[in-house]
Amino acid sequence: LLLALALPACGSADVPEATTPLKRGTGVGLKRIGSFEAPVYVAGAPGFPKLLFVVEQGGTVRVLRGGHELGRPFLDISGLISSGGERGLLSIAFPPDYRRTRRFYVYYTDPAGNIRIDEFKSRSATRAARGSRRAIVQIPHPVNANHNGGQLQFLGDWLYFGTGDGGSGGDPPNNAQNPHKLLGKLLRVDPRELRPDPQVFSIGLRNPFRFSFDTVTDPGRPRLAIGDVGQDEFEELDYTTVAAAHGANFGWDALEGFAPYRGANSGTPDPGGTVKPIFAYPHSRGGSCSIIGGYVVADRHLPALYKRYVYADLCEGELRSLVPHLHGASGEHKLGLRIDTPSSFGEDTRSRVYVASLEGPVYRLVPR
């Protein structure tokens, strides 16, 4: 599998046996926007609404203008990274003031396996400037090639990112529950500082490969949605206010989904006071293996999905949605849309939602 990532519309360990597809005529389709080399993320840049950036795992960022791919990549750091399996160039983020500063950030694994976040500057709207690289964060990831995390997201001036627990099975070093380790965490950093120092924001995560902020459900109280990849039994969705997530413990490796974790290297006691997922689903559902966390849709041109959370599973391939609540979820549905090996969702500056397939295609969710 590319990613070792890892909940149901309920607040208990019970998992629904099946979900119901959306009825015909509810109006969601897929529009193919291009084909790329192992695309793993899609993003827009504030101030440039006609541009769309596609991250390729091998180390390049492609740019589309007005829906058309440009010939030269926006960025090529293939010489700086290790790629393959769960490693590679994994995401890109543009700050709110990008049009003025031209600074942007990428998350990747280097040849030694370390997790790195670097800053670059763009010389034009469609090309990064050579020689502009500045190291922001480096986190040792010395033993295993999996569970690297990979997401970057801005909320205000803070750059948030999620790290995996260091890999293997059951988090043998207990990184996720150790507040002094930077693995198995949601972290944030102020990249404007001269020497940026990452802060632990939340602990107890296994591999939060994709997370997002929900600013549409309650604009005054932004919420955080984390697709945290499970190990043997369950995939989970964590959803809470950003304020409540600060200092929160999401439970791994004492818990997997709603249940005590009982696989390899189990035995970590439940620390108590953990934030439980709002939704979990078993690997027995359609051959599932790894949640691909998405977005709470803010695009009003998609009324069938407006304020609903969209997500998928790497192995199952079905696109699904649900209504997230702070203490549960409701209305979990198949969208009647399936793609091979979904690797990520993405969002542009107009809140339009995209989904990438590791096989190459990238699609936009459109009304129909």
Question: Residue locations for each model-derived region?
Answer:
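Bacterial N-terminal signal peptides
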Residues: 1-9
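Acidic, Gly/Ser/Thr-rich repeat motifs that build Ca2+-stabilized beta-propeller blades
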Residues: 10-170, 210-234, 287-323, 327, ...
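Surface-exposed loop and turn segments in beta-propeller and other repeat-based domains
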Residues: 72-87, 132-148, 182, 187, ...
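Beta-propeller blade termini and top-face loops
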Residues: 163-167, 174, 179, 188, ...
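Short, contiguous, pocket-lining structural segments
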Residues: 174-182, 199-207, 212, 229
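Beta-propeller fold recognition
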Residues: 235, 239, 243-258
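Conserved blade-ending motifs and adjacent loop-strand segments that build the rim/top face
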Residues: 328-349
